[in-house]
Amino acid sequence: MVEVICATSFLIHLATRKIKNIDSVDTEIGQIQFVVPSAVLNELKKLSKTQKKKQDAITALEFARNLKTTEMSGKFADQAIIERVRKRGGMIATIDNELKNKIKSLGGSVMSFSNDKIVLES
């Protein structure tokens, strides 16, 4: 089973939108497990206190209760994820272009969305 580490942006999108191919992702790329870093949970808790992102953050936090979590500390979630990829490689799920490029430059794999479908980027 491949663990896919979720960035904040991806988790919010996953929790708040209807994803067209969510049930077939396992058959397309093998069995996956979404994993939520503690740094992402902390970021979502902060966002849940802001007016602009409050509802999306709360929805994502509720959604994350059903996912595996992993300890990954850092001042910022993206930085914690980058450090993890730098040390161990892995697959990261994000919709943030800057984070995508950094992960790819470190040799990591990227999962994202296109037209509300989960896709692997090369």
How should each PLM-predicted stretch be described?
Residues 39-122:
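Nuclease catalytic cores that cleave nucleic-acid phosphodiester bonds
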Residues 1-66:
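Domain-level signal for Mg2+-assisted phosphodiester chemistry and nucleotide/NA-binding surfaces
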